[in-house]
Amino acid sequence: MVRQFKRRRYCRFTAEDVKEIDYKDLDTLREYVSETGKIVPSRITGTSAKYQRQLATAIKRARFLALLPFCDAHEQ
């Protein structure tokens, strides 16, 4: 059997030298929220633990201020 080489995911925020994640930067936050409105885990995105905590806090603040939805748009 041939082993598949899995590319190591890297932390985008570390590479760009971001100091703090802003809750008003909605374009960045939307990339880390799934279609159902859940925060995507760091094992999938490759985000480091420090920035994953900041990301979760920023997403929760944006949700509370109604900048991001809590869940997806339900069609009835």
From Swiss-Prot:
GO terms for biological process: translation. It comes from the Bacteria. It holds the Pfam family Ribosomal_S18. HAMAP family: Ribosomal_bS18. Coiled coil: none annotated. InterPro entries: Ribosomal_bS18, Ribosomal_bS18_CS, Ribosomal_bS18_sf. The lineage of its organism: Bacteria, Pseudomonadati, Pseudomonadota, Gammaproteobacteria, Methylococcales. The gene is rpsR. This is Small ribosomal subunit protein bS18.
